[in-house]
Structures are given as C-alpha cells and as structure tokens.
Amino acid sequence: MRYLLSEKAKQDIEKIWLYTYENWSLEQADRYYNLILDEIEFIAENFESGKSVDYIKKGYRASIVKSHIIFCKKSRNNIVEIIRILHQKMDMENRIDE
C-alpha cells in the first residue's frame, strides 16, 4: 500500500534526524531515521496494527517507535497519510494540528 508524508511529518522527521545527529552521532541519526521509515512502511501495509487514537482525532491511528509516535490516517482513496511524528513527551492533542 502507498503512503504519503504530510509537510509537517516531513519537517518532524528532519528535526528528529538533526537533533539525533547533534546530540549523538551521524550513525545514530541515520539508524533512527531508518527505524522510523521502516515503521512507516509497516504501517502502510498494516494500517490496522496501529492503535486507534480517536480521542485525539477521529480516524487517526498511532504507532510507537522508541521515543516517538507516528500519527496516521487512511485517505478516501486508500492511501495511508502520515500526519505527524511527535516525541512522546509532547502535548499530542495540541501539536497534532499545528
């Protein structure tokens, strides 16, 4: 199944990579980036495996990768849309629609 990254999700993953690079290493940043991308590809093929988070936004699902949560929904044309990738300590309900 196909997936689409929102502009915010693209920015999120770039910020995650940069933060990891600046605080750990290039190798760790690349490893974490690839881990997140692997999970996105898994979600695209197994959308129902994500936990329903209707309490945040109706129709959204979430999947955890280490310290981050990937939020997604399925579009009308059956494409999985990755909405945001947020750190677990963030205020999800307010940050999801920023």
Could you say what each language-model-derived stretch is?
Residues 48-79:
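Basic/aromatic recognition patch in beta-strand/loop cores that engages polyanionic ligands
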Residues 1-33:
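Arg/Lys-rich, positively charged N-terminal/basic patches that mediate binding to nucleic acids
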Residues 29, 51-53, 94:
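Short, hydrophobic secondary-structure boundary micro-motifs
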Residues 68, 73-98:
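Enriched for short, Lys/Arg-rich terminal
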Residues 44-45:
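Short proline/glycine- and basic residue-enriched helix-capping loop/turn segments at helix->loop/beta transitions
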